[in-house]
Amino acid sequence: MNQGHPQPDMYYSPHYSTPQYGYGYSTNGAPTTAVSTPMPAPQNVLPVPSALSNQGAMQQPGYSNSSNNGAFDTTGQHNPPGMKPRVTATLWEDEGSLCFQVEARGICVARREDNHMINGTKLLNVAGMTRGRRDGILKSEKVRHVVKIGPMHLKGVWIPYDRALDFANKEKITELLFPLFVHNIGALLYHPSNSNRTSQVMAAAERRKHEGLGGQRPPAPNALPSIGQHHPMMPGLPTGGYVPQSLANGPQSLASTPQPLANGSQPPMPNGGGMLKRGREEEEDLHRPVSNGHDPMSNMHAMSNGYPQQPPLANVHQPPMQNGGDMLKRGREEDDEVHRSAHNAHDTMNNMPGSMPGMSNAYAQPLPNVHHQPLANGDGGMLKRGRDEDDDHRSSPNGHDSAGNFEAKRRKTITSNDSMVSPGGFYTLHNGYGQPGVMNGMSPYKRRDDEAETPRPGPNVHDHLNNFDLKRHKTMETSVPAPQYDAMNRPHSSIGTSPSYAPAPVYDNLARPASTVAASPSYPSAPVYDTAARPPSAISAPRRQQSFG
């Protein structure tokens, strides 16, 4: 928020060439004499304190205050002699109001434009009042508005205009705060030299105030209108008479261009029509009937790149290319390969133009010399990268069958019997249900193929999951059988002991004396004391002497 960045031309300058002030202000504050240019010094955030200029004005001749002649202005509408008004304006964005600011004694006192309330805290600070007295006076006010956030000169307790004027008169600071209490304070900003600038500032403040209110009030008459009101034909704003250029070349040509004739020439297309040449050759191959009814994918391994070579059409003249050439060709090649398995009457995708919805194995009826109207702008190049993944599910040039071709060949072998062909040219469905749709070009029997590829026990099966157990089982069968222990024919002691050590000897306690069994073999046997032969004092006396000593 702007905290008061006044322009040099928004208020009057305190410097004049002569100390006499021979002009007076009317009620609206318009001066009668032109003033000099503003001072060239750079301005601060707030204008120079007017108290300094007021002190200089007191020393000027002709100035009389209330102490001299009692001519004290209690209304605040007339300027003191030798003093010129200084006022700045700032938009208070938080409150959505314009604030007029007057500085006295280095303190900025603000007044709102909408309700004319004045910051009482700053006003009493100009009077030099202590904080305790100031807060006590402001708390006793019935109508007050406390502001705790925002710029410093806007914080404080805001009081009505009348109460602020009473406080200023009691503290004798009304003239010091001139022109804070002037009724038409906004007119002081309209200096003859900067009236245009002031009008722009006021209009901008009014416009921002309405924007801050969220459009609750009608916009100001001098506010800028919206872009759509003055520029209805701008490119970013589509109107009723605006037609996008992309429709003129793209979808419009699809609706207005007639279908090409069967054996005639096609008209040249304005935008990328020639890029469909090789793409249409692939489109013709989609609808070309298959003579033998066999899968053309069976011959794919003999090709160099996995695509069968088809002769170009001889009876249809293709339009010339202008721009965008090869984009749809490669995209249509992938589209051709996706549908190519459907030409041999083994369509698992059920997407041939002549196939019946409920019969997925129906033979597709050919549509000779009928073309699909392609896109005019030639965005088919986007199809190639999207359908490269579909090529991975068909055939690769190294001769290995993927899941889709393996299943197609297997079904070709099963359904090649003539007894399974109905007179109408359709393969009969044995269970009466159509096969489910295919996603991403994958065969519906892919999961069954994966289950069929599960390794089974055999001589040539690779090691996958179950063969590890199979080899381990064979190893266990060919290994030397473990010896069978006969616990009945062996002594009990030899089973529980280690074979490297001799069995422990069994001692006969009856044949040996008890002293030799308990004594260590490296030391002689301890003598046996006869307590009956010795007096008891001889045995226990040394211990008593040691215990008491």
Swiss-Prot record:
Residues 278-288, 332-346, 385-395 have a biased composition (Basic and acidic residues). Residues 246-266 have a biased composition (Polar residues). The keyword Membrane does not apply. Its main location: nucleus. PROSITE patterns: HTH_APSES (PS51299). It is found in: Nucleus. Residues 532-549 have a biased composition (Low complexity). This is Cell pattern formation-associated protein StuA. GO terms for molecular function: DNA-binding transcription factor activity; sequence-specific DNA binding. SUPFAM superfamilies: DNA-binding domain of Mlu1-box binding protein MBP1. Transcription factor that regulates asexual reproduction. Binds the StuA-response elements (StRE) with the consensus sequence 5'-(A/T)CGCG(T/A)N(A/C)-3' at the promoters of target genes. Residues 120-141 bind DNA. SMART domains: KilA-N. Induction: Expression is regulated by the upstream regulator ada1. Residues 205-227, 246-288, 332-466, 514-549 are annotated as: Disordered. Residues 86-192 form the HTH APSES-type domain. Residues 516-545 are annotated as: Nuclear localization domain.
